[in-house]
Amino acid sequence: MIRSIRHKGLRRLYEDDDSRGVMSEHAEKLRDILARLDAAGTIADMDVPGFRLHPLKGESKGFWAVTVRANWRVIFRFADRDVLDVDYIDYH
C-alpha cells in the first residue's frame, strides 16, 4: 500500500483523481502505476511488461523505478509491504 508520495501533482492524482499536476499524456499510465503500487506487496509485483522495473544506484540506492514515458520515471521504495517516497521525475 502507498504510504507517502513526494510529488504534489502525483499525490493529487492518487488522492483525488485530479491530473492537473502531471503531464496530461502521462496521466493514464500514472494511474496504472499508482494502482499497481497500491496493490503491490513485494517489488516483484511491479515487474510488469512495459514498466521496465529497475533498481536505482548511487544517491538513490534503495529506490526502484518504473518508466512512464521516455525519460520520465516513477521512483519508490518498499519497507515491509508498504510503498514509500513515491516520486515522479524527469531523470535528465
Descriptions of predicted regions:
Residues 1-33:
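Arg/Lys-rich, positively charged N-terminal/basic patches that mediate binding to nucleic acids
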Residues 24, 28-31, 47-50, 70:
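Generic alpha-helical scaffold signal
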Residues 15, 42, 81:
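Residue-level marker of positions within ordered structural domains that often coincide
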Residues 41-64:
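A short, surface-exposed loop/turn module that caps and links secondary-structure elements
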Residues 37:
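Conserved phosphate-interacting/catalytic interface
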Residues 25-27, 60, 87-90:
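Short, surface-exposed linear patches
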Residues 54, 65-92:
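Enriched for short, Lys/Arg-rich terminal
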Residues 1, 9, 18, 42, ...:
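Glycine-rich, flexible loop/turn motifs
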